[in-house]
Amino acid sequence: MSDRIRVRYAPSPTGYLHIGNARTALFNYLYAKHYNGDFVIRIEDTDKKRNLEDGETSQFDNLKWLGLDWDESVDKDNGYGPYRQSERQHIYQPLIDQLLAEDKAYKCYMTEEELEAEREAQIARGEMPRYGGQHAHLTEEQRQQFEAEGRQPSIRFRVPQNQTYSFDDMVKGNISFDSNGIGDWVIVKKDGIPTYNFAVAIDDHYMQISDVIRGDDHISNTPKQIMIYEAFGWEPPRFGHMSLIVNEERKKLSKRDGQILQFIEQYRDLGYLPEALFNFIALLGWSPEGEEEIFSKEEFIKIFDEKRLSKSPAFFDKQKLAWVNNQYMKQKDTETVFQLALPHLIKANLIPEVPSEEDLSWGRKLIALYQKEMSYAGEIVPLSEMFFKEMPALGEEEQQVINGEQVPELMTHLFSKLEALEPFESAEIKKTIKEVQKETGIKGKQLFMPIRVAVTGQMHGPELPNTIEVLGKEKVLNRLKQYK
């Protein structure tokens, strides 16, 4: 194990970057950067059936978008490569041969049907399913007989009996496993491909990984990996297992849970900001001192302390994510937010696919109107429905406002002045409303609320003069005249 902090994020290229995996990558990144160490990305691609053609590219693209810059990987070899497991067979094979030669591993010829029958029988007896060791001591004659039958062997690790495997987890504290509860497990599958627990231990050792930080669904893998380290006389890395991420029902976040968007790609498509998502994910199972919740990446690196990783499950709060992103949206200049929102405006046919300067100018005004309210760039479409949909039927409260005694007088004066107004801009509209106030004597809520309800159908919203400008003269006059 290296004295220098070296951590790794090791995804399989089987799909988009999941929130849970993004958190694993992010905490490893913060830990490495806090201690001036190395953040390594290794691709665990030995499951060829599940690998997607663009799975690896997607992982790297989304990690880069989040701001997780790696020090080593397939594109940055620092002497510890190859960084794809599929390219490391030449490293694994001599070690497999060594374990076989030292009788620390053996060939198992049992078929899938035989193993399944054993498993079902154990479950029927109320026992924990585990391999019973039927082929742990085959004679050479028995091995030859199985091979003559055409059976392909897997290779199993010979688990030492009556031994306790313990490790001091940086999150959970001391964790122990009794080896008698772990059957001899497969280190090489029948197709010759090393299994996860074997390959990952070998890779972590040869890449001099100092700390393995991952989700607590990997706790049960840890004793098997420690066995591999001990079999070769190597020092294991330090381990840290992060708490689960749970949904509103406090159930483990599942990829089948349709209530929560779970892939970074989905948040990108909606127009979330990478620094906001970074901020939100960094607080899933970790907390800083104090009450502050908004930090830059550099601030997170400075204050990160692995001792503050939580043992309790981390709640994925959709409202909290929306709030965090809104804080960042408010800080951005309008042009940045407009460029993020533009594809959404085009998709909703609010702006033509080939927009004119006039279209773009209108779009910028629309964004300026809603920027402080927006949780994400794509939200501009539902927020601004009044600009492109028919006026909704008024609710009871809105009806009371618009049926006020002074409303016809108010609308008549306002309609007349706005009809003649040029240029139709917010500053001039504001002056016009003040003139109407002086002429009619109507003021306060009796002035502003009926105007807002008449032109938007809503009781509340952004600055009224700005809203009227963005709606445009024709639409505003059409909406006002029915209340004259």
Swiss-Prot record:
SUPFAM superfamilies: An anticodon-binding domain of class I aminoacyl-tRNA synthetases (SSF48163), Nucleotidylyl transferase (SSF52374)
Keyword Protein biosynthesis found: yes
GO molecular function: ATP binding; glutamate-tRNA ligase activity; tRNA binding; zinc ion binding
Presence of keyword Disulfide bond: no
Catalytic activity: tRNA(Glu) + L-glutamate + ATP = L-glutamyl-tRNA(Glu) + AMP + diphosphate
GO CC terms: cytosol
Chief location bin: cytoplasm
Compartmental location: Cytoplasm
Gene Ontology annotations of biological process type: glutamyl-tRNA aminoacylation
Residues spanned by motif 'KMSKS' region: 252-256
A Pfam match: Anticodon_2
Keywords recorded for this protein, A-Z: Aminoacyl-tRNA synthetase, ATP-binding, Cytoplasm, Ligase, Nucleotide-binding, Protein biosynthesis
Enzyme Commission code: 6.1.1.17
HAMAP family, per the entry: Glu_tRNA_synth_type1 (MF_00022)
PANTHER family: GLUTAMATE--TRNA LIGASE, GLUTAMATE--TRNA LIGASE, MITOCHONDRIAL-RELATED
Self-association and partners: Monomer.
Its biological purpose: Catalyzes the attachment of glutamate to tRNA(Glu) in a two-step reaction: glutamate is first activated by ATP to form Glu-AMP and then transferred to the acceptor end of tRNA(Glu).
Protein name: Glutamate--tRNA ligase
Species name: Staphylococcus aureus (strain Newman)
